[in-house]
Regions:
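N-terminal hydrophobic/helix-forming segments and targeting peptides
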Residues: 1-372
Length: 372
């Protein structure tokens, strides 16, 4: 019998994690999953993720680095510090017992995800319908965004500098939005195209209204009605879109997936599953030997460019400030600290899918519940 064969002392054993979990382990697994589902349901933009992490970190005793710099407060082993950049990138530190130049232990992940962004002047009317003009951010399958309930998340900065947080489409009483598609009876030509060409990026316009304002003398009555609704609720005018950053994301909560609740369906798991678990791990660290860091950044989906991506000098500048508050700043200290550090830069991979076995090599693929 196969089961009676002697196990090799040299070969790798592929065990299923579920077989190894104790009842206590299983309880912890599903409690973590529930916390993660709640996080993924509420935090659908990089700004929302960073705000959540900052709030939790402050409750856990982390201090804002900028406040410490202004107070010229020295850092010692065990101190907890965070630095934030433009509300879209955050780094958390627990100061170690050993000198910073001995290196740091770093976890890294990104908190941005593929999505649709509103353009600077997005609202327009066409044939009695109000729409929002968008462009896509990151790598998306354009056809997946058709006829899906969508929500708007973001911030608007008004002319007087007031910042307004916007979330529409998540509460039960909220409307949702969507990108329209063709009826199957009208899609003969569309169906002949490849998946990549069947939906053009320029057609990913979000339908947001169809009722005209009660004034027959004005032009673009449906658009004007949408502007009135936004003004009544948020006090904004059309010009405020120019200084807004509004993201279009799938509406609705993350959910357990499968009869056995063994999987999770959520928008943005690339790479927030790594960001969330890195943050959870960071919250358990107290007085390490080496300084520990969790670095959660923006802009990975478009090449890590820009002020809040890893092409910026945010991390190096933050390490320099940390070294200064530890009382041992020098260019050489920073260089040694970075050179001697070790980092796990985590991102997601696809598990082997029996529906598409041709795109993966089983011997090198990851499997649900088993890893690689």
């Amino acid at each position: 019998m196969e089961d009676n064969k002697k196990k090799s002392p040299f070969a790798k054993e592929y065990e299923i994690a579920w077989d190894k979990y104790s009842q206590k382990d299983l309880k912890n697994v599903f409690e973590l999953a529930d916390r993660y589902i709640d996080f993924m349901s509420r935090c659908k933009t990089e700004r929302e993720c960073v705000e959540e992490f900052r709030n939790r970190a402050e409750k856990a005793g982390y201090k804002n680095l900028q406040d410490l710099i202004e107070a010229n407060k020295k850092l010692k082993a065990g101190d907890k510090v965070y630095a934030e950049l433009m509300g879209k990138t955050i780094a958390l530190f627990v100061i170690g017992k050993r000198p910073l130049e001995d290196g740091m232990l770093i976890l890294g992940a990104h908190v941005d995800s593929p999505r649709l962004d509103l353009k600077q002047n997005p609202l327009y009317e066409d044939t009695g319908l109000a729409l929002l003009d968008t462009h896509y951010y990151g790598g998306i399958k354009k056809y997946q965004w058709m006829t899906m309930p969508l929500a708007l998340h973001g911030v608007i900065v008004k002319k007087d500098g007031t910042k307004i947080n916007v979330v529409i489409g998540e509460d039960d009483g909220d409307p949702v939005f969507g990108v329209s598609d063709l009826l199957i009876h009208l899609a003969k030509d569309q169906m002949k195209k490849s998946l990549a060409e069947g939906v053009e990026g320029e057609k990913l316009n979000v339908l947001v209204g169809s009722i005209p304002i009660n004034d027959k003398k004005v032009k673009n009555r449906v658009k004007q009605n949408i502007l009135k609704i936004l003004n009544d609720k948020y006090g904004i005018v059309e010009e405020d879109f120019v200084s807004a950053e509004i993201e279009v994301v799938p509406a609705g909560r993350a959910r357990h997936y499968g009869f056995d609740n063994s999987m999770i369906m959520a928008y943005g798991q690339d790479d927030r599953v790594c960001a969330y678990t890195s943050f959870e791990a960071m919250m358990e660290i107290e007085k390490p030997e080496k300084t520990c860091v969790t670095l959660l950044v923006d802009k990975e989906e478009i090449g890590s460019v820009g002020a809040t991506g890893m092409h910026s000098r945010f991390f190096e500048n933050t390490v320099a400030e940390i070294a200064n508050l530890m009382g041992n700043y020098s260019e050489l200290t920073i260089r040694r600290a970075l050179a001697n550090s070790k980092m796990i830069s985590s991102d997601v991979s696809a598990a082997f899918d029996p529906n598409y076995p041709e795109v993966m090599e089983k011997q090198s693929a990851a499997f649900f519940g088993k890893g690689i």
